């Protein structure tokens, strides 16, 4: 293989990487642009509940930790209250911010996991192209302001996974941070609590399979912090949504 052909292959691979990363980013940009252009600033379905009760702006613990739709969602309700206070409840502004931050965050975190795991930009970009299928604004945006609460736990979980897998800082610093991220995921929506539990158990199992020695112990210790967060959040979630409410969809 000549130097010229090597150079051509290198440039071709570089352009392919850029193209495969560009399309998902472009899709997110167009989704945000479409929402700014065609979005309607009006509450929709579940958004009306806070207005009718007159507490949509409330940050009281009783309000934030109430059980609604078979879940505790204090993190999401707090974000809704802040949006009401500082954005005037503007649906267009709120959903644009949540769409770009949540979907953009998921894209960035997945790219980081791919590039760190594969150690090859071309392979990572090919895999990254598949995130384009999750960039459907109508999934969690374009209807209720609060619908994105169900996607937000993924951001916290992926952040925790990044710390577990790649962070080399002291467990004394990383452990509590992983716990906080897990608790945020678990108290954003009930699916987040279940996701944290499943993820932590999976990570602990992988620590025996993928690593050995000190690295395996460190990986497992960080996973234990995530497990603690899963137990902390899933216990009240299960109590309020299944035991107390008896699985009845209310609110």
Predicted regions and their residues:
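Membrane-interface micro-motifs in multi-pass membrane enzymes
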Residues: 44-46, 73, 122-165, 187-189
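Helix-to-loop transition at the C-terminal end of transmembrane segments
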Residues: 29-49, 139-140, 236-251
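Membrane-proximal lumenal/periplasmic loop motifs of glycosylation machinery
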Residues: 38-43, 56-99
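Membrane-interface transmembrane helices that cradle and orient dolichyl/undecaprenyl
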Residues: 157-175, 212
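Membrane-interface alpha helices of multi-pass inner-membrane proteins
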Residues: 158, 173-196
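Perimembrane helix-loop-helix junctions
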Residues: 5, 195-231
